[in-house]
Amino acid sequence: MSKDYGTPPENWREVYDEICKMKAKVVAPVDVQGCHTLGERNDPKKFRFQTLVALMLSSQTKDIVLGPTMRNLKEKLAGGLCLEDIQNIDEVSLNKLIEKVGFHNRKTIYLKQMARILSEKFQGDIPDTVEDLMTLPGVGPKMGYLCMSIAWNKTVGIGVDVHVHRICNLLHWCNTKTEEQTRAALQSWLPKELWFELNHTLVGFGQTICLPRGRRCDMCTLSSKGLCPSAFKEKSGITITKRKVKTIKRVKKRPASESPPLSPLSLPTDDLYYQSIEDKSLIKLEDLDPVDSISHMNEPLKKEPAADIDVDQKPPVAFHSTTKETRSLRRSKRVAKKSSQYFSQQSLQDIEDLV
């Protein structure tokens, strides 16, 4: 790893050549829909403007989305995407045309402001220095250096995006936290003739093999030759992740034949009488003669003749007997509740056994 700026890694050239060989065998999205392919080269001034627009739209946007968006602008705008088109179109319509790119609301404002600044300060053309380019809204160092290389054919710096920053740190070419630190570290030792092509090569390599998620180290020759310090080996290209599956413990159901026999409960056979209450926690039974209670069940019902009712006669006064015999016929709440709970539990247990 290069610890100090200006000190190149020992095997950087061998590593870079291997990346170029792998990159030559695949077609990456940047090869066909990158910013350097989206401008009309038959008109140099228009090409420079379209390149700047493409770079401004490229931030937080994939190339597979950037390409169709640029074609949409060229087809829908009257001048085929020139400075006058951006000046004349309203923000709502422009926002609709670029709605697929990331942060399209903010980029709509940037494009309108950029067109006004170019018309007022730069005679309708884009600036020819990085410093002036970065004065435009929404244009940073990466866009500025790439625009100088593509639009003006002047390479004054390395355009470092997330792919270049990530891969250079994986290769231990630098140990940096930001894209600007990576650019300064690379420019301190990388030959200047490789500054422009480095971005295109590493971006394509990062889009096809050294992916941000799920790096294909099994396909990378840097891994097989031991040139990548961050490579990891897998048995196959398929990564199997084991998950813990929660299992529900099933209780073995007991058949009804094995259920324990019900124990008989001795209940008083005396006549029971309960007064009705609101919560219905007591059992209300009919009054029966304790001696003839069983014999009455087998006898047929007898209809008694209706007695003559005297309208003027007053109804008898009801009274409660307090004799010992009457008190013994009353059943306490405790006994009633206990017997009710017993039968409820036995019934539920029998139902569970049957199910």
Curated annotation (Swiss-Prot):
<dbReference type="InterPro" id="IPR011257">
    <property type="entry name" value="DNA_glycosylase"/>
</dbReference>
<keyword id="KW-0378">Hydrolase</keyword>
<feature type="binding site">
    <location>
        <position position="217"/>
    </location>
    <ligand>
        <name>[4Fe-4S] cluster</name>
    </ligand>
</feature>
<dbReference type="GO" id="GO:0000703">
    <property type="term" value="F:oxidized pyrimidine nucleobase lesion DNA N-glycosylase activity"/>
</dbReference>
<dbReference type="GO" id="GO:0051539">
    <property type="term" value="F:4 iron, 4 sulfur cluster binding"/>
</dbReference>
<feature type="compositionally biased region" description="Polar residues">
    <location>
        <begin position="338"/>
        <end position="349"/>
    </location>
</feature>
<feature type="region of interest" description="Disordered">
    <location>
        <begin position="303"/>
        <end position="355"/>
    </location>
</feature>
<keyword id="KW-0227">DNA damage</keyword>
<dbReference type="GO" id="GO:0034042">
    <property type="term" value="F:5-formyluracil DNA N-glycosylase activity"/>
</dbReference>
<dbReference type="InterPro" id="IPR003265">
    <property type="entry name" value="HhH-GPD_domain"/>
</dbReference>
<feature type="short sequence motif" description="Nuclear localization signal">
    <location>
        <begin position="44"/>
        <end position="50"/>
    </location>
</feature>
<dbReference type="GO" id="GO:0034039">
    <property type="term" value="F:8-oxo-7,8-dihydroguanine DNA N-glycosylase activity"/>
</dbReference>
<protein>
    <recommendedName>
        <fullName>Endonuclease III homolog</fullName>
        <ecNumber>3.2.2.-</ecNumber>
        <ecNumber>4.2.99.18</ecNumber>
    </recommendedName>
</protein>
<dbReference type="GO" id="GO:0006289">
    <property type="term" value="P:nucleotide-excision repair"/>
</dbReference>
<dbReference type="GO" id="GO:0006285">
    <property type="term" value="P:base-excision repair, AP site formation"/>
</dbReference>
<dbReference type="GO" id="GO:0006284">
    <property type="term" value="P:base-excision repair"/>
</dbReference>
<keyword id="KW-0326">Glycosidase</keyword>
<dbReference type="GO" id="GO:0140078">
    <property type="term" value="F:class I DNA-(apurinic or apyrimidinic site) endonuclease activity"/>
</dbReference>
<feature type="binding site">
    <location>
        <position position="210"/>
    </location>
    <ligand>
        <name>[4Fe-4S] cluster</name>
    </ligand>
</feature>
<keyword id="KW-0004">4Fe-4S</keyword>
<keyword id="KW-0496">Mitochondrion</keyword>
<feature type="domain" description="HhH">
    <location>
        <begin position="122"/>
        <end position="149"/>
    </location>
</feature>
<keyword id="KW-0411">Iron-sulfur</keyword>
<keyword id="KW-0234">DNA repair</keyword>
<dbReference type="GO" id="GO:0003677">
    <property type="term" value="F:DNA binding"/>
</dbReference>
<keyword id="KW-0539">Nucleus</keyword>
<dbReference type="GO" id="GO:0003906">
    <property type="term" value="F:DNA-(apurinic or apyrimidinic site) endonuclease activity"/>
</dbReference>
<feature type="binding site">
    <location>
        <position position="228"/>
    </location>
    <ligand>
        <name>[4Fe-4S] cluster</name>
    </ligand>
</feature>
<dbReference type="InterPro" id="IPR000445">
    <property type="entry name" value="HhH_motif"/>
</dbReference>
<feature type="site" description="Important for catalytic activity">
    <location>
        <position position="161"/>
    </location>
</feature>
<keyword id="KW-0479">Metal-binding</keyword>
<dbReference type="GO" id="GO:0005634">
    <property type="term" value="C:nucleus"/>
</dbReference>
<dbReference type="InterPro" id="IPR030841">
    <property type="entry name" value="NTH1"/>
</dbReference>
<comment type="similarity">
    <text>Belongs to the Nth/MutY family.</text>
</comment>
<dbReference type="GO" id="GO:0008534">
    <property type="term" value="F:oxidized purine nucleobase lesion DNA N-glycosylase activity"/>
</dbReference>
<dbReference type="Pfam" id="PF00633">
    <property type="entry name" value="HHH"/>
</dbReference>
<feature type="short sequence motif" description="Nuclear localization signal">
    <location>
        <begin position="252"/>
        <end position="255"/>
    </location>
</feature>
<keyword id="KW-0408">Iron</keyword>
<dbReference type="InterPro" id="IPR004036">
    <property type="entry name" value="Endonuclease-III-like_CS2"/>
</dbReference>
<dbReference type="GO" id="GO:0046872">
    <property type="term" value="F:metal ion binding"/>
</dbReference>
<dbReference type="Pfam" id="PF00730">
    <property type="entry name" value="HhH-GPD"/>
</dbReference>
<dbReference type="InterPro" id="IPR023170">
    <property type="entry name" value="HhH_base_excis_C"/>
</dbReference>
